[in-house]
Amino acid sequence: MSNKGQLLQEPFLNTLRREHVPVSIYLVNGIKLQGQIESFDQYVVLLRNTVTQMVFKHAISTIVPGRAVHFSTAEPADANSNNG
């Protein structure tokens, strides 16, 4: 995975994990999983509901938080935003 992707994924997933935000995870095959993110690494997300499921990131289409979340990448503004 590119470094740019990790700059967004890690703070987003960490916020969801730390704040115990309920999430819906949609897989590429259309299946919807629900629970709370327990942990994650470069390749998988551990999703806890009645049991803990290991979900491979390559199978994930979308992660939808159950409420609004605010997170920071702690990086300066994107260079592309200075196109004016």
Curated annotation (Swiss-Prot):
InterPro entries with a match to the protein in the record: Hfq, LSM_dom_sf, Sm
Sm domain location: 10-69
PROSITE patterns from the UniProt entry: SM
Alphabetically ordered keywords of this record: RNA-binding, Stress response
Gene Ontology cellular-component annotations: cytosol
GO BP annotation list: regulation of DNA-templated transcription; regulation of RNA stability; regulation of translation, ncRNA-mediated
Record note on quaternary structure: Homohexamer.
PANTHER family for this protein: RNA-BINDING PROTEIN HFQ
Name of the protein this chain belongs to: RNA-binding protein Hfq
Species for this entry: Verminephrobacter eiseniae (strain EF01-2)
